Amino acid sequence: LLAGALAGTAALYVNRGGPVHGEAETAATGAAPECPVNPAHAEAISAAAVGDVAAMLAAKPSKQLSGLAFKGPYGKALSIGDFKGRTVLLNLWATWCVPCREEMPALDALQAKAGDASFEVVAVNVDAGEDQGKRQRFLTETGIRSLKDYAEPTMSLFNATKREGLALGLPVTLLIGKDGCLLSAMNGPANWAGADALKLIETAKGL
């Protein structure tokens, strides 16, 4: 059922305040520095991104994303740099984004299956200027148990990824290596609970 629901919304990821999908963004000045080219990593990710996660395009060139900042549980200031040494699947979502809401149980299942000392699904809520309790209520009502509570209520995280040309709308998902370098990116939802996603993550963890 989840795969079917996601398939029905795959082309309908949301750009609040703008059109739905299809509009490329031009990276602004102050762009993140590029990481050293690693053809082997790009080739491995491209080979593993099939089926449910075929839209996860390998980063060519890669970008250094350690500076992306957000809040962790209890409001603790964090950045991707705090996850150095771990592979991260960074997902930006909002409670008003229907495809995001449908995708969350699959992300939770992926964290339950693959989350360990070397990997974490970091799902960051980007609801801005709204009732922040709405996020916790949604997570509780949806039965999200494995994902930690990450948030960035000022939209600066989304805008940073948008400036880099990575985010066109929500949800947006970035696979980030142990060194903080982008491995691959995707706009729109996916079935993260399936075998294809697990294979991609296991490949990334081995890089």
Regions found by a protein language model. Name each.
Residues 141-146, 151-203:
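Thiol/disulfide oxidoreductase modules built on the thioredoxin-like
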Residues 84, 92-109:
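Conserved redox-active cysteine motifs that mediate thiol-disulfide chemistry
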Residues 86-88, 92-96, 128, 169:
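Short pre-active-site segment immediately N-terminal to redox-active cysteine/selenocysteine motifs
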Residues 1-65, 207:
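N-terminal targeting signals for export/organelle localization
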Residues 57-62, 67-88:
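A short beta-strand-turn-helix
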Residues 88-90, 122-124, 174:
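Conserved hydrophobic packing residues within short motifs/helices of P-loop NTPase cores
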